[in-house]
From Swiss-Prot:
Function noted in UniProt: Converts N-acetylmannosamine-6-phosphate (ManNAc-6-P) to N-acetylglucosamine-6-phosphate (GlcNAc-6-P).
Name assigned to this protein: Putative N-acetylmannosamine-6-phosphate 2-epimerase
EC number: 5.1.3.9
Family under the similarity heading: Belongs to the NanE family.
Gene3D superfamilies: Aldolase class I
Protein's gene: nanE
Protein's UniProt keywords contain Cell inner membrane: no
UniProt catalytic activity: an N-acyl-D-glucosamine 6-phosphate = an N-acyl-D-mannosamine 6-phosphate
Keyword Acetylation: no
Organism: Lactobacillus johnsonii (strain CNCM I-12250 / La1 / NCC 533)
Top-level lineage group: Bacteria
One GO molecular-function entry: N-acylglucosamine-6-phosphate 2-epimerase activity
Length: 230
């Protein structure tokens, strides 16, 4: 799938992120739960998916035929990047045939010692036809990653790094600035409500991802149970 085909499939619809990490209620060693989430997402009208781990991606692909953004979350302390942080994770994801691979494209120090520009160049040299998405937290990071060769820039990490504003809502200003700059933006992060989604739609990015507000029942339930604590 090329860049234009991917945009045509996802634009005007919603990419739903289906993830569960160790320690979360929906995580199991053998998997099997995220494919059901993905199936529900497809039946609800999602135009794409975002998934974590080779296992989940492969299991989802067996029952759902939506285009997918794939990542591998793997910690390499003390460095902070953990979303597809090295070529090892990229190699694993390429083997799954996932349509887009997302990487941490912040300017923070990396486990492999490379700059993010060197990492992007290495990926695009090894896998020239692989679509690549940059998970970033601010305008500088996104612009840098796009100029380095990624196909899409995501606002995924805004609010989660020291280099971005701490808010409890989507970074509307960042999404708009990137769209206005002519970058292919996948808006993601802290979209909690349909009203916030509508605001993002009005900015008209190439794609939009919603995750926790749909597929993390513990997080969703807490928004209700917390009412009793106030």
């Amino acid at each position: 799938m090329n860049k234009e085909e991917f945009i045509n499939k996802i634009h005007g619809g919603l990419i739903i992120s289906c993830q569960a990490l160790p320690g979360e209620p929906l995580y199991t060693e053998e998997g099997g739960i995220m494919p059901l989430m993905a199936k529900a997402a497809q039946e609800a009208g999602a135009t794409g998916l975002r998934a974590n781990s080779v296992r989940d991606i492969k299991q989802i692909k067996k029952i759902v035929d939506l285009p997918m953004i794939g990542i591998i979350k793997r910690d390499y302390p003390p460095e902070k990047p953990y979303i597809t942080p090295t070529m090892k994770e990229v190699d694993e994801l390429v083997e799954t045939g996932v349509e887009v691979i997302a990487i941490d494209a912040t300017l923070r120090p990396r486990h492999d010692g490379k700059t993010v520009n060197e990492f992007i160049k290495e990926i695009k040299t090894k896998y020239p036809n692989q679509l690549l998405m940059a998970d970033t937290s601010n305008f500088e990071e996104a612009k840098n990653a796009y100029e380095a060769g990624v196909d899409f820039v995501g606002t995924t990490l805004s609010g989660y790094t020291e280099e971005s504003p701490k808010t409890d809502h989507p970074d509307f200003d960042l999404i708009k600035a990137l769209v206005d700059a002519g970058l292919p933006v996948i808006a993601e992060g802290k979209i909690h409500t349909p009203e916030q989604l509508k605001q993002v739609i009005d900015i008209n990015p190439a794609g939009i991802v919603v995750g926790g507000a749909i597929t993390r029942p513990l997080q969703i339930a807490k928004t209700f149970t917390s009412v009793f604590e106030n």
